[in-house]
Amino acid sequence: MNISQEVARRRTFAIISHPDAGKTTLTEKLLLFAGAIQIAGSVKARKASRHASSDWMEIEKQRGISVASSVMQMEYRDCVINLLDTPGHQDFSEDTYRVLTAVDAALMVIDAANGVEPQTIRLLQVCRARNTPIITFINKMDREVREPLDLLSEIEGHLGMDAVPFSWPVGMGKSFGGVFDIRRDRMRVFRPGQERRSDDDDIIDGLDNPEIASRFGSAFEQANGEIELIQEAAPAFDREAFLAGRQTPVFFGSAINNFGVQEVLDALVEQAPPPGPRQALERLVEPQEPKFTGVVFKVQANMDPAHRDRVAFVRVSSGRFERGMRLKVARTNKEMRPNNVVSFLSQRRELLDEAYAGDVIGIPNHGVLQLGDVLTEGESLRFTGLPFFAPELFQAVEVKDPLRTKQLRIGLTQLGEEGAIQVFRPEAAGGTLLLGAVGQLQFEVVAHRLKTEYGVEARMLPSRYTMARWITSENPRALRKFMDANAAHIAYDVVDAAAFLIGSPAQLRVAEDLYPDVKFHAMREHGGQVFGSHA
């Protein structure tokens, strides 16, 4: 196959949801139905040492939440599917945002009992801002849940897009019998509680088939009436509207019981777009271009604790990657020749020889690559849109054993470069390192990882700071004057960008009034250190 043909069969998407909506379970079942794994590691049951394939970090196994974004690749119906499982806990929205910059579509999971929840709305706003197409899976229909028509109205109201059902539940809770595939005019009847995929599911053709009515009685009667209603009232599916983020295909099911998963997988192949062009500051990069370009959207330390490694996750933006090819790191202008590049099934890795636009590859390295780095075959490019948000919570960090100070700094540097936490180094000599986060759980995760991965017992201490703003100025003297006058509140992050640490909004307003030539930024971008959104 040539590059264009390989790109056309790629599908790269992220799974997003509110915590506990069943996202990790659905990830497992998609892998199961695609044949990538033979048995799903049920997150709820936790049989012996079996854990969900996509929850691999020690703290994730203990707490049953996804805190690092996992990447998994599988083949299904001659398509190469790159699935990115994002953090399910609300404190990790920043890492989720960065993952959403690396995908061409999103699969939104909604808990049928709770409907559209706040975290989902925030993530959907990110997708809408990027015009990312969204497929919706309404999960947990085997429980006592809300009426499907109400859920559709809520999706449309909150998300501002038309919801177009592709499948419809027959019953719910104890009377849940399966899902009716509206487009194929057939019902798939599932046996609940399966860990293994079943290739001999009961399929009943035709909405008017008397067998459905006789087997499912009043549950089917209600479903039949609702299907007739939505076929009259709901807009027809328009793929262009879907690709522009104005329509979302909706599927119902129960991931833990394998209900409705097959239909979602088929829709990802049939409806989700192949990789599209990517905007760099210099030009638009087309996926079919012959030369390789890629962006580091995530850095993960210690994927293999035995080897203390660090892997840069690179989304291939264009061309073909070949193992051992010469690549330029645009930020440093240095050359590298990665030989042991890997593809993923969560933390299980396989060496790969080639990759194409849309694929996610892992490049093991020792700090050469940072978040936002652009790799090319020689061209200088800076891709846009990979942000760091100013933290809202701060804690000082000290090491309990002074002899482990070096390990603390190494650990925090790596975790900071990975984006797990923001680390600020005070300009004032002898200042304590500060950690910045967007949610409290980040501090707990970092303390746990310092202990298990770096052998460091860290002590977290309260901080007087509540805000941070990165500072720039077109007038170097004005910036220096501000930094000298506020030296006690200046710190540097892991890429040595200067930040002003603040105790209250009033303090920020005073600084803005006194130093009009200095700009205060609530977001730092990686594309060539371009700054966005002011205070």
Curated annotation (Swiss-Prot):
Q: Which family does it belong to?
A: Belongs to the TRAFAC class translation factor GTPase superfamily. Classic translation factor GTPase family. PrfC subfamily.
Could you say which residues bind GTP here? 17-24, 85-89, 139-142
Any GO CC annotation of this UniProt entry? cytosol
tr-type G domain: residues covered: 8-276
Q: What does this protein do?
A: Increases the formation of ribosomal termination complexes and stimulates activities of RF-1 and RF-2. It binds guanine nucleotides and has strong preference for UGA stop codons. It may interact directly with the ribosome. The stimulation of RF-1 and RF-2 is significantly reduced by GTP and GDP, but not by GMP.
Per the record's keyword annotation, is Aminoacyl-tRNA synthetase included, yes or no?
no
Q: Which keywords does UniProt give here?
A: Cytoplasm, GTP-binding, Nucleotide-binding, Protein biosynthesis
Decide whether keyword Protein biosynthesis is in the record: yes
Q: Which domain of life is it from?
A: Bacteria
HAMAP family the UniProt entry points to:
Rel_fac_3
Name used for this protein in its record:
Peptide chain release factor 3
Q: Subcellular location, in the record's words?
A: Cytoplasm
Q: Which terms does the record give in the GO molecular function aspect?
A: GTP binding; GTPase activity; translation release factor activity, codon nonspecific; translation release factor activity, codon specific
Give the principal location in a single coarse category: cytoplasm
Among the record's GO biological process terms, what is one?
regulation of translational termination
